[in-house]
């Protein structure tokens, strides 16, 4: 079978399943064996979409590194808008790999910045990712500086949707311990006026924690009850479910916390 046969089989069984991923990886091997760059790119693009939903960032990173090399080689046609959009996925996920140094992370983000400038894209996504990374790395002064750049940068079609932007703002306020402001920022998400495929799924866990910190146990419980239904057993929402576990332990719901933790451990790829 050639690469396209494997990709067709993956589509038949469902690309965003473990079996689908296995077949896509077979497609990549077949394409590389035949030195078929176009098929190899198409298969890796398919793999990136599948692993994004399945929570497999390492596979995603390896596929993207190859795709970027082909993009820079300029041997085949590549949709730069699509590839640069996927750059955001990789950049946000790379901080979770302990084996990747800060210098390597900085190099990747500098490359992203230069490519965005080259295509005359807004740097708003770049500065937002930098802000989120500084939050993850415990660099409060950098967080403040980078957020100012994020807020000041112009918007364009490479920006995330309004619901995702609001979600990130909620996380920013929670990071700074301003729980009331986090809740206030989230009103449009709680009401459903702003939503997308990932939000408020990503937001409910941190909101449960924020409400608990504010002493509103009823609202916190409601966020868990409604929110976990959206994210239960889904690998792409493991971080949100980790927030729910934190909420359950903070509120001393030990049995429920253990139940959720055990269920989500089974989801890990």
Which sequence ranges carry the predicted segments?
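Residue-level signature for tetratricopeptide repeat
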Residues: 9, 13, 30, 50, ...
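Long, ordered, amphipathic alpha-helical scaffolds
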Residues: 242-269
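Helix-turn-helix repeat elements of alpha-solenoid scaffolds
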Residues: 13-26, 55-69, 97-111, 134-149, ...
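Alpha-helical adaptor scaffolds
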Residues: 206-215, 232, 241-246, 252
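Flexible inter-repeat linkers and adjacent short helices
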Residues: 1-104, 254, 261, 269
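Generic helix N-cap/helix-start motif at coil->alpha-helix transitions
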Residues: 1-7, 40-42, 84-87, 119-128, ...
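Extended alpha-helical scaffold segments
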Residues: 124-130, 134-147, 154, 163, ...
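Solenoid-like repeat scaffolds
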Residues: 29-36, 68-77, 111-121, 148-160, ...
């Amino acid at each position: 079978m050639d690469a396209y046969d494997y990709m067709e089989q993956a589509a038949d069984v469902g690309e965003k399943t473990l079996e689908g991923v296995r077949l896509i990886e077979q497609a990549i091997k077949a394409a590389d064996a035949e030195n078929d760059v176009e098929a190899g790119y198409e298969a890796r693009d398919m793999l990136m979409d599948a692993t994004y939903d399945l929570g497999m960032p390492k596979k995603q990173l390896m596929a993207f590194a190859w795709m970027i090399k082909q993009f820079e080689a300029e041997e085949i046609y590549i949709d730069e808008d699509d590839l640069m959009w996927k750059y955001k996925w990789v950049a946000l996920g790379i901080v979770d790999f302990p084996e990747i140094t800060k210098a390597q992370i900085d190099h990747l983000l500098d490359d992203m910045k230069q490519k965005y400038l080259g295509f005359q894209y807004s740097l708003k996504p770049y500065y937002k990712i930098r802000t989120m990374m500084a939050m993850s790395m415990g660099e409060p002064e950098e967080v403040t500086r980078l957020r100012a750049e994020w807020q000041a940068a112009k918007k364009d079609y490479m920006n995330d949707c309004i619901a995702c932007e609001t979600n990130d703002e909620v996380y920013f306020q929670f990071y700074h311990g301003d729980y009331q402001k986090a809740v206030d920022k989230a009103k449009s998400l709680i009401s459903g006026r702003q939503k997308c495929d990932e939000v408020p799924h990503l937001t409910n866990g941190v909101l449960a924690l924020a409400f608990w910190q504010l002493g509103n146990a009823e609202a916190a419980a409601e966020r868990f009850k409604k929110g976990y239904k959206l994210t239960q057993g889904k690998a792409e929402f493991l971080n949100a479910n980790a927030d729910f576990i934190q909420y359950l332990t903070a509120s001393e719901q030990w049995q429920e916390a253990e139940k959720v933790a055990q269920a989500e451990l089974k989801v890990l790829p």
